[in-house]
């Protein structure tokens, strides 16, 4: 009679075979990811091809080091061991390593991270800072021994001597490189004497340049308050640091040129050009003022100053005549009133009435004289004030105070810019005039 095995015994036997089979200890398998749903820790999914499917397990530690995100339908190459799960009698592969089929893991990780950061807005143009036109100190984050720092120093020194270069020695590849780049970007931003940063390194493989594709480096450049120029690898190399930086330079020399957009020669030419423009503007202004002075000096007021106050003198004469006639009329009227009063009083027998009329006459006379005197004083004061204002414009009075008036060809001279060596001048003074010849002209500001 045949011995029947229990399901448990058969399963244990098969598991023992699986565990002891050297071919199942390390299996190289290609398949398409199926039934994948990302979990917080361990990942469970299927690998399939056109004819078969196998369950797959990836522990959390392996998944964390994967470097790219698993996606439904992605074809991958895995290394793992096949095991049998006794309770269900099913077998699966426990994946120890995986990479995309046909494309490197780093290349896939690059594309996935680029897609993620693009969606989050890290590379948008609106976040880019403008580079300053003039800098006094540039921070450089790179290896102290590479050609990058030498090229930057040489180019900056040639384009704008005097600009300082501050090197932040940084590990640019391998373990810990990304962390050093981030730390030095933050150190540079704590300084107040830097105008911008250049972050870069020489060329290399994608593995060599990978520190500049790390998300923490992208975030540090994005958060930098200092404008950042990225110069990573050769012209054909592109990293995520290039996308997030404010400007990307193909070479260290190009980065140095971007950092010093205006050379010292350009600046000096600009200063000279501005000086010339300012000088010409000043000359035009002086010429305009001189023409105004010349025109004013030839006006009627300066050639015949007495005509300035002729009209006022005539008005004063008219007012004086009017005042005198008014005073005469009022005196005549007062005399007539007095005669009438005297005649009336002569016919009166009352002494008190006479005295009262006499008092009224005396009061009226005083008021009249006071009013006439007040009007006369007021008109006289106005006349004297107008006369003083007009006489202050009289050149003869100005000369009388000790000043001199210089004429050239009967035209008033107001500035030494009107005079040249050999000119014949007339100097008018209070007691005569001098005819002189100019021996020398010196410009001095008073």
Swiss-Prot record:
It holds the Pfam family Exonuc_VII_L. Its EC number is 3.1.11.6. It catalyses: Exonucleolytic cleavage in either 5'- to 3'- or 3'- to 5'-direction to yield nucleoside 5'-phosphates. GO terms for molecular function: exodeoxyribonuclease VII activity; nucleic acid binding. It is found in: Cytoplasm. PANTHER family: EXODEOXYRIBONUCLEASE 7 LARGE SUBUNIT. Belongs to the XseA family. This is Exodeoxyribonuclease 7 large subunit. It comes from Streptococcus pyogenes serotype M49 (strain NZ131). The lineage of its organism: Bacteria, Bacillati, Bacillota, Bacilli, Lactobacillales. The gene is xseA.
């Amino acid at each position: 009679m045949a011995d029947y095995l229990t399901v448990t015994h058969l399963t244990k036997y098969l598991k023992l075979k699986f565990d002891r089979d050297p071919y199942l200890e390390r299996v190289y398998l290609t398949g398409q990811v199926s039934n994948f749903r990302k979990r917080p820790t361990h990942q469970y999914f299927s690998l399939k091809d056109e004819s078969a499917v196998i369950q797959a397990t990836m522990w959390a530690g392996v998944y964390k080091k994967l470097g790219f995100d698993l996606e439904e339908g992605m074809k991958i190459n895995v290394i793992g061991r096949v095991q049998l799960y006794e309770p269900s009698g099913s077998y699966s592969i426990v994946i120890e390593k995986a990479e995309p089929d046909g494309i490197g893991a780093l290349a896939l990780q690059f594309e996935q991270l680029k897609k993620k950061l693009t969606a989050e807005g890290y590379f948008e143009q609106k976040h880019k800072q403008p580079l300053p036109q003039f800098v006094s100190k540039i921070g450089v984050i790179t290896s102290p021994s590479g050609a990058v720092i030498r090229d930057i120093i040489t180019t900056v020194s040639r384009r704008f001597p005097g600009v300082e270069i501050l090197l932040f020695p940084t590990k640019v590849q391998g373990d810990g490189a990304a962390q050093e780049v981030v730390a030095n970007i933050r150190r540079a931003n704590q300084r107040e004497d830097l105008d911008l940063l250049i972050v870069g390194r020489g060329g290399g493989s994608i593995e060599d340049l990978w520190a500049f594709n790390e998300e923490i480096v992208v975030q540090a450049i994005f958060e930098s308050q200092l404008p950042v120029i990225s110069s990573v690898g050769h012209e054909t190399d592109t990293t995520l640091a290039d996308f997030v930086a404010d400007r990307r330079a193909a070479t260290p020399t190009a980065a140095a040129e971007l950092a010093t957009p205006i050379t010292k020669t350009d600046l000096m030419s600009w200063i000279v050009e501005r000086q010339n423009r300012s000088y010409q503007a000043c000359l035009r202004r002086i010429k305009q003022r001189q023409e105004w002075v010349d025109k004013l000096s030839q006006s009627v007021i300066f050639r015949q100053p007495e005509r300035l106050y002729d009209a006022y003198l005539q008005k004063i004469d008219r007012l004086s005549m009017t005042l005198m006639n008014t005073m005469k009329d009022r005196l005549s009227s007062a005399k007539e009133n007095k005669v009438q009063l005297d005649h009336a009083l002569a016919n009166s027998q009352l002494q008190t009435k006479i005295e009262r009329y006499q008092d009224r006459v005396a009061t009226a006379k005083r008021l009249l004289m006071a009013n006439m005197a007040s009007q006369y004083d007021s008109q006289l004061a106005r006349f004297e004030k107008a006369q003083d204002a007009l006489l202050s414009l009289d050149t003869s009075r100005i000369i009388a105070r000790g000043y001199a008036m210089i004429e050239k060809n009967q035209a008033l001279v107001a500035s030494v810019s009107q005079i040249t060596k050999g000119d014949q001048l007339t100097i008018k003074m209070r007691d005569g005039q001098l005819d002189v010849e100019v021996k020398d002209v010196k410009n001095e500001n008073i």
